[in-house]
Design a protein with these regions (language model features):
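Mature catalytic domains of secreted/periplasmic carbohydrate-active enzymes
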Residues: 1-270
Length: 270
C-alpha cells in the first residue's frame, strides 16, 4: 500500500516513547474537597489556598523522576481561576495567600525542581475561568450582554498569562514546556466565551515552538483544530485499540473529529 502522508513530528513521536507522564492537579480544590471550584464566591485567596510552607517541590519531582516518569503536567490555573504563580494580571493568585508570606511561587518551585532533575514539563492553563470578571460577555454595569457590547477582553487576559509564563525562563524545565494542555469545559449563557485560539497558539509557539528555535512545535491538547495530541474519550485511563489512528481536522470550522464512540475516541484507521 501507499505510504500514509500523516506521520508524527518529533514531539508526537517522543510523546509515545515517554510512556509515563504525571498530571498534577494542584490548587485551591486540593484543600476544599471539590472538583471545579464553582462556589468559592468572594472567599479570599488566603482562605481557599492553604498550602503549608513545608511544601517540597524537590521531593515531588524527584519521586516522579525515580519512578520513571518523563513529564509532569502542572495545573497552573484550573477552572476556579486561581493562579499558583505570582501573576501581574490578577490578585487571585498565590501572592495573596499565607504561603511563604506571599513570596512563594509554586509553579516556579516545581519548574526549578524539574530543571534540576531533567523532567519535562507540560502547562495546564484552563481557558474557562469562573472567577475572572472579563470572562463572558457583560456591559459596564456587570449585566449580561452580547459579544459585540462586551466591555472586558478575556482573550487578552488569557494571552497575557500565556506570555507571563511561557515567556519567562524561570518557568518550565530550563524555561521550556513540551505541551500546553487546555480543557473542553466552559461556561454557558453570558459566560459562553469565544476563544481567540489563533492568537493564543501564536503566542505559545513563539515562546515554545519552532519559532523559538525548538526542534518541533509545542504539543497542544484540547485545542480544537490545532490539537496535536488528542483525548482518548474518557477519564478512566483506558484507551481503545485504535486510539493511535488519525483524526479528521476541519480547519475552516476549527473542529477536530476523532470518531468518538462512548467511552472512546477511536480515530480513523483508513
Amino acid at each position: 500500500p501507499a505510504a500514509d502522508k500523516v506521520v508524527p513530528d518529533a514531539n508526537q513521536y517522543k510523546y509515545q516513547k515517554d510512556e509515563l507522564a504525571a498530571f498534577c492537579h494542584f490548587g485551591p480544590n486540593t484543600f476544599n474537597e471539590v472538583e471545579w471550584g464553582e462556589h468559592y464566591g468572594n472567599r479570599s485567596p488566603a482562605d481557599i489556598f492553604t498550602l503549608p510552607n513545608n511544601f517540597d517541590a524537590d521531593t515531588l519531582v524527584s519521586t516522579l523522576k525515580n519512578a520513571g516518569f518523563k513529564k509532569v503536567i502542572v495545573t497552573a490555573k484550573h477552572h476556579d481561576g486561581f493562579c499558583i504563580w505570582n501573576s501581574a494580571y490578577t490578585d487571585y493568585c498565590v501572592k495573596n495567600t499565607h504561603y511563604k508570606n506571599g513570596k512563594g511561587d509554586v509553579l516556579a518551585e516545581i519548574s526549578e525542581a524539574c530543571t534540576k532533575y531533567g523532567l519535562d514539563m507540560g502547562l495546564y492553563l484552563s481557558p474557562w475561568d469562573i472567577h475572572e470578571p472579563s470572562y463572558g460577555y457583560y456591559d459596564a454595569n456587570g449585566k449580561p450582554t452580547s459579544k459585540e457590547n462586551d466591555v472586558l477582553d478575556y482573550n487578552e487576559y488569557y494571552n497575557n498569562q500565556l506570555e507571563e509564563i511561557l515567556g519567562n525562563s524561570k518557568y518550565g524545565n530550563n524555561g521550556h514546556f513540551v505541551e500546553v494542555w487546555m480543557d473542553g469545559a466552559k461556561g454557558s449563557g453570558a459566560n459562553a466565551q469565544d476563544y481567540e485560539f489563533t492568537k493564543w497558539f501564536d503566542t505559545i509557539q513563539k515562546h515554545q515552538g519552532k519559532k523559538a528555535g525548538k526542534d518541533a512545535d509545542c504539543m497542544l491538547f484540547g485545542a480544537q483544530a490545532y490539537t496535536t495530541v488528542r483525548w482518548i474519550g474518557n477519564e478512566d485511563g483506558v484507551a481503545h485499540e485504535n486510539t493511535w489512528a488519525k483524526s479528521k481536522v476541519n480547519e475552516a470550522n476549527n473542529t477536530i473529529d476523532s470518531n468518538g464512540t462512548t467511552p472512546y475516541t477511536i480515530g480513523y484507521a483508513d
